[in-house]
Amino acid sequence: MVKPTSIPNAYAGGALDRAHRMRRDRAWLHERLLHPGSAVLPLWQGQPLIRQAEAPAPALIGASEISAAFEKGDWALLGVAGDQAVFALELGLSGAEAPDLSRFGTFTELRQVGPILAREDAALLAYARGLMLWHGRNRFCGACGAPTRSEEGGHQRRCTNEACAIPHFPRTDPAVIMLVTSGDKALLGRQSAWPSGMHSTL
C-alpha cells in the first residue's frame, strides 16, 4: 500500500517580503527597476528561465542587464529580500520569439523541474508564473471589454475606460489533487499536450 505523505504547498513556502506597501510607490518601483542590485526572473510564454547546474534553480538576472526588455513585456514586483527587489518579466507576449538568454539558462516548463527544485525556488517560480499568466488572461475588462493596464507593481489591473475604471486583482482558484490507489497500484492521468511519458495524479 502507498504510504500517505504530506508535500508542502509551493505557494506557501516563499521567503520574499511581498512589499505590499511599496507597490504603490511609483518612484520606488522605477528606481528598483533600474537598480543594479535588483533581480529579474524572465519568463517566456509562462516558462521560467532555469539555470541548469548540479540542481536546477531560477535564473535571476541583474535588472540592469535586461532593463530594455521591461518596455516589451509584462512585469511584476514579486517582493524584496533584504535590499534586493525581485521582479518577474514575461517576454513571450504576442507570439514573440524567445530571446537568447542561453548564457543565463533555458526557458523550461515548470512541471519538468518543479518536483526537484528547492522549496523556496519552487515557491518563487510558482508565484511568478501564476502572476504572469493572470496578466496574460486579463488584458481586457470583464465588465466593459476595454483594455486594462497594470498597476501597483503588477498586482492589479485597472480598466482604462474612465466610465468603468474597475480594478481587477489576481485570484487563486481552488483545486483538489488526489491519488487514487488500489493496493500497490495508483491511477494516473495525462493530457494529450504533455510530453511523452509525463503522467500526473488526478
Label for each model-derived stretch:
Residues A76-A81, R157-C159, V180:
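Short acidic-hydrophobic surface loop/beta-edge motif
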Residues H35-Q47, V86-L89:
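Short, hydrophobic/proline-enriched secondary-structure or compact coil segments at domain edges
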Residues M1-L29:
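Short, Gly/Pro- and small/polar-rich lid/capping loops
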Residues S38-A39, A76, V176:
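Residue-level detector of short, conserved catalytic/binding motifs and their immediate flanks
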Residues I66-R137:
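A broadly conserved sequence feature marking short terminus-proximal activation segments
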Residues Y127-I177:
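Cys/His-rich short segments
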Residues A19-R23, W28, R32-L34, W44-E71, ...:
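Conserved Nudix-box catalytic region and its N-terminal flanking loop in Nudix hydrolases
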Residues D83-Q84, H155, D184-K185:
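Beta-strand-connecting loop/turn residues
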